[in-house]
Amino acid sequence: MKLLIDAGNSRVKWALYQGEDCVRQGAAEHGELAGLAAVWRDLPLTGAWMSSVARREVADALAAAVPCPLHRVHAERRFGDVRNHYRNTAEQGADRWLAVLAARELCRGDVIVACAGTALTVEALTAEGDYLGGLILPGHGLMLQSLAQGTANLNRPAGEVVDFPQGTQDALASGAIAALAGAIAEQRRRLAERTGRAPATVILTGGDAARIAPWLAAPMQIVDNLVLMGLLKVANT
């Protein structure tokens, strides 16, 4: 069996695969990693594959908890028919690359891949397999947190998302969603301009995917655990 680990900025997701079948999965906050070694210790593992954008001490703790050979996955210049045009793949988060590889399996046309977690990443992938790069911006929670910490009067709960906010709490909620949905829409527009084709499908993943989806006027799929899907693709080669 193969253990796949996606170590994000705030949480760790993992899944156990027998062939193409997911037989077990779980998640933990960074402060809850101690229990994972006990969970994984008795599993009949043949190997483990990890993508990490977490702090080094988190990645090291996960590596120590894995009771079998561990493969740390990084972004590459090419995988299959996907070509990575990132200037320096060594500085690119593996999670972004793996999400693109998974999206390629789901959609063979032009696609925008949006991962909505602690940060929002918005990637552009053409039907020809050219991964053009993408955006990184603060996620929903981080955006509101930065306003609370960086201003004198905005440390308050966000309200409702409305078209024309007439109160500060609604303005916070609406502004955050407008920024996130707007970034996705703008990359979709840019990709259509680049290719000369119809605007792309959006594949949306991450903890805030459902929060953003209602505000996107685009054909879309919400896909859970997209990074783990990409890890499985790499592990099976």
Swiss-Prot record:
Catalytic activity: (R)-pantothenate + ATP = (R)-4'-phosphopantothenate + ADP + H(+)
Keywords: ATP-binding, Coenzyme A biosynthesis, Cytoplasm, Kinase, Nucleotide-binding, Potassium, Transferase
Binding site for ATP: D6, A7, G8, N9, S10, R11, V12, K13, T118
Active-site residues (renumbered): D95
Cofactor: NH4(+); K(+)
Binding-site list for substrate: Y86, G93, A94, D95, R96, T168
Pfam short name (any one): Pan_kinase
GO-annotated molecular function: ATP binding; pantothenate kinase activity
Subcellular location: Cytoplasm
Role: Catalyzes the phosphorylation of pantothenate (Pan), the first step in CoA biosynthesis.
Assembly and binders: Homodimer.
Name of the protein this chain belongs to: Type III pantothenate kinase
Lineage per the UniProt record: Bacteria, Pseudomonadati, Pseudomonadota, Betaproteobacteria, Neisseriales
